[in-house]
């Protein structure tokens, strides 16, 4: 997910995206803990996407 795509979204859409990413992160962590996760790079990717969304939410809240 690109930051440029996220900047075009509203605050409500960003909050929805954040919830979806957190759910996905939880599911990936559970798969990793049970040894079922084949693509371990997804954990890092989702964690960074969460950070991008949170950063944009903070920027929009300050503006």
UniProtKB/Swiss-Prot annotation:
InterPro entries recorded for this chain?
Ribosomal_protein_uL29, Ribosomal_uL29, Ribosomal_uL29_CS, Ribosomal_uL29_sf
Q: Could you confirm whether the keyword Ribosomal protein appears in this record? A: yes
One GO-annotated biological process of the protein: translation
Under the heading SUPFAM superfamilies, the entry gives: Ribosomal protein L29 (L29p)
Q: Look up the record and report any one GO term of the cellular component aspect.
A: cytosolic large ribosomal subunit
Q: Which UniProt keywords apply?
A: Ribonucleoprotein, Ribosomal protein
NCBIfam families per the record? L29
Q: What is this protein called?
A: Large ribosomal subunit protein uL29
Q: Which organism is it from?
A: Shigella flexneri
């Amino acid at each position: 997910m690109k930051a440029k795509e996220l900047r075009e979204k509203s605050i409500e859409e960003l909050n929805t995206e954040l919830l979806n990413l957190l759910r996905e992160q939880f599911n990936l962590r559970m798969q990793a803990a049970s040894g079922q996760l084949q693509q371990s790079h997804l954990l890092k990717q989702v964690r960074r996407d969460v950070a991008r969304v949170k950063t944009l939410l903070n920027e929009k809240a300050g503006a």
